[in-house]
Regions:
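Phosphate- and other anionic-substrate recognition elements at nucleic-acid/protein interfaces
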Residues: 1-182
């Protein structure tokens, strides 16, 4: 694993962060957002797909790490809509021969800060420190994408090896026996 593409999926704004870890240290290559201008779902999905494909073609990552789908039971429609964003990202990755691994928000927070309930500010401080940034990463979608990419890197460094059979597109199966997982 040398280049990790972290993605925070969203229908209107999808954050991404590309890091190079080939030297054993983390180096930020690029971070940004793919903004959907379309008012229609099919247009939004197409714009996300095109934007992520462009990032993949530019940086040629070895893997895509994405935030795991989560929604409150009061808002099932949110999960369905977010599933569309995740689906087109998984398709873009698959068509480039890349595996996608997902991490829940609690797992990302715990790996980055040691606290699964860390605040956004604590996460941003951890990212700023690790990437040697002069300011906090903004907007929040970018910060989340960088946190996910860093989480995947630290996950591997902590000795948790991911078998190819556990890399299912959009499904978190890294800790199948971990009962603390969200």
């Amino acid at each position: 694993m040398k280049i990790i593409l972290g993605i925070d999926p969203g229908l209107n704004t999808t954050g991404y962060g590309v890091i190079d870890v080939s030297s054993g240290k983390v180096r930020l290559l690029e971070a940004g957002v793919v903004r959907s201008q379309s008012k229609h779902l099919t247009g939004k999905v197409g714009e996300i797909y095109d934007g992520i494909r462009e990032v993949i073609e530019t940086f040629k990552p070895d893997i895509v790490a994405m935030e795991q789908l989560y929604t409150h039971y009061d808002r099932p429609t949110t999960a369905i809509l977010m599933g569309h964003a995740r689906g087109c990202i998984c398709l873009a990755a698959n068509q480039s021969g890349l595996d996608v691994v997902s991490y829940g928000a609690t797992k990302v927070k715990k790996i980055l800060t040691g606290n699964g309930r860390a605040t956004k500010d604590q996460i941003q401080r951890a990212i700023k420190l690790e990437l040697n940034l002069t300011t906090y990463p903004e907007p929040p979608d970018v910060a989340d994408a960088l946190a996910i990419a860093l989480c995947h890197f630290y996950h591997g460094r902590l000795g948790v090896h991911v078998k190819p059979s556990e890399l299912h597109h959009g499904i978190d199966r890294l800790f199948p026996n971990d009962i603390s997982r969200q």
